[in-house]
A protein has these predicted regions:
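Mixed-charge, Lys/Arg-rich low-complexity intrinsically disordered regions
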Residues: 1-13
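Tryptophan-anchored aromatic micro-motifs
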Residues: 14-23
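Solvent-exposed strand-loop boundary residues in beta-sheet-rich modules
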Residues: 24, 38, 50-52
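Short beta-strand-centered aromatic/proline hotspots
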Residues: 26-39
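Intrinsically disordered, low-complexity, charged/polar segments
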Residues: 52-103
């Protein structure tokens, strides 16, 4: 895992995971995952991946977050909009990133 703020890749793909310090209604640590949606205008969203709320989609990301002709999120957009669109309770400099879960 690395800090999201240190990520240099220009795009973040479906299946990527963000680990944050949670607050109510989440556990002490919570993972969020980039998922595909069924909304053609907003094809990617963020879903809770761990704990009691696992499986809940918390946001369908806006079109400006999506990299053209791909199903990926702009890393720069996500860094600039983390607290507005994803999870304001955890500052961006404390968000951890991994490309996907490894089993």
């Amino acid at each position: 895992m690395q800090k999201l703020v240190d990520l240099e890749e220009p795009q973040i793909w479906r299946g990527a995971v963000f680990r944050v310090k949670g607050s109510h209604p989440y556990e002490e640590l919570v993972d969020f995952m980039v998922v595909e949606t069924t909304d053609a205008a907003r094809p990617l969203g963020i879903m809770v991946a761990t704990g009691y709320s696992a499986g809940h989609t918390i946001v369908h990301l806006p079109p400006e977050a999506i990299v053209l002709r791909s199903k990926s999120i702009s890393t720069a957009w996500l860094k600039a909009n983390w607290s507005k669109w994803v999870y304001p309770d955890c500052p961006i400099d404390q968000v951890l990133f991994m490309k996907n879960y490894v089993i």
